[in-house]
Design a protein with these regions (language model features):
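Domain-core detector
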Residues: 1-134, 139-195
């Protein structure tokens, strides 16, 4: 009911920034209220999505050491695209979301960048291969350290971050496959699969 009232009062843009997990539902409601019919082109573009980001939800990579709460989140980086960038990369940069590892892994089984998987498959490991072979993006890791009361808001621009090295010196070690922090362009065969 709150969302419905908000739609009529014109505050949807504000709500959407908080409710990423209901993005598809809200898009459908907007289309319904606007009476939009999907064209063939818009149906194609629906295969490019940015996934659901829940940066303040619990992650397997979160931990507490000596009363300090540590969290690792990831952003699609660099925050720039070119004229030749893929639609997926453009949408990821534009969305400017902060993801947990689990959010990104969930995209591996969803159609978010159709056709870039092995043999043209619609799904593949976004965690390892981002926008697909030749992509210029990677997952940039951000380590947050919260002290005091509360859970810590990773979406806040004032959220305290520390370097990965500092976190490791304090006992917070998170290990990922090396490909997570690599651009597919810098991988063997530029991230493409040899057949």
């Amino acid at each position: 009911m709150y969302i419905k009232n908000c739609l009529y009062r014109g505050c949807l843009a504000h709500i959407r920034s908080w409710y990423y997990d209901t993005e598809d539902e809200l898009d459908a409601k907007i289309d319904e209220l606007n009476g939009k019919k999907k064209t063939a082109l818009s149906k194609f573009f629906d295969f490019v999505r940015t996934g659901t980001a829940r940066p303040n939800a619990k992650s397997e990579q979160d931990t507490e050491i000596d009363g300090a709460k540590y969290k690792v989140r990831y952003e699609y980086y660099p925050k720039k695209v070119s004229e030749n960038s893929r639609l997926f990369c453009k949408k990821m940069v534009q969305a400017n979301k902060m993801y947990r590892k689990e959010d990104i892994l969930k995209m591996d089984s969803q159609v978010v960048n159709a056709g870039w998987g092995l043999n043209g498959a619609d799904t593949y490991s976004i965690w390892l291969y981002k926008g697909g072979g030749g992509c210029h993006h990677k997952w940039r890791r951000k380590t947050f350290k919260f002290t005091g009361v509360g859970k810590g808001d990773t979406k806040s621009p004032l959220a305290p971050t520390i370097s990965t090295n500092k976190g490791e010196k304090e006992g917070y070690r998170v290990r990922n496959p090396k490909e997570v922090a690599m651009r597919p362009k810098d991988m063997p065969n530029q991230g493409f699969v040899n057949k």
